[in-house]
């Protein structure tokens, strides 16, 4: 699993921290309304309010940065870039705007440009501020994606000491991921344990630790993190079902997941579908994937998962439809898997020109994927 990077909380904090200057009453009211909508994740309404604020006072960087961040959440990257550029034209020292530009580049897979923007944001930000922390996390993520794992470790070193407690769980986890890539199991596990000191009840954290350790070749250590979940006092059918699925004990996974699914848990439907797929119960797997897709049409990961399922079933044309729908959603966290599977689909369909073009585009964004490089060459 590729390292996932959460930005919403940091964006909200950055928007809240921008100082208003020279604004009229109407613009200020629209800005406040926009912030309320943004904090409630109603980005369409937030964008409308921020646009009205900008129209009323086009010389206010806070309004432009807030609009750009909202456009980011709406995946309108060209519009977001324009908003951040306008803010920078007004204030060459606007760290928030440079950070926003970096996020646009990051989501578009333009990592060199992203690093330049984040570096600029860091140089303009307070040494203990959230903009600096957020920008350095992105900078390290760019290094990680491009295969500069030692560089990522060095960048995390700069952040961790001065980071807030709320950030440290994620930062230790991310540095641990980089250590795994450097084949440094000991330091990776030390960082994972430090991460758990700050956040010990997050199931996804254990699963991500399991996945990264397993992918790094440390299978026994990886499974120990999942088994710790089963030792918890709290009995959680969904948690147990997901854990048994990851451990490959599919009969027990079904036992727990079916119970949750019958109680209406949508996440249980997703994991139950994957469990049925692993058990070669394709009829039930297909039914549940379709059900989950119907309820989560904007989840790029499910399009990739279902696309991979269809590839394994030899239904390449159908798989391509779902994979390309997922790509259109523009989710950078899911994009690597989607782009890779798109290229694989073309190859299996014997459309070798399109397969080569797709692998070429993939390798521009993920140049260190040796398996993809081998396919391309």
PLM regions: where:
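TPR alpha-solenoid repeat register
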Residues: 63, 97, 131, 135, ...
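Register position in tetratricopeptide repeats
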Residues: 39-40, 73-74, 107-108, 145, ...
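Structural marker of alpha-solenoid helical repeat scaffolds
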Residues: 56, 90, 124-128, 162-164, ...
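Canonical tetratricopeptide repeat
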Residues: 66, 73, 100, 134-138, ...
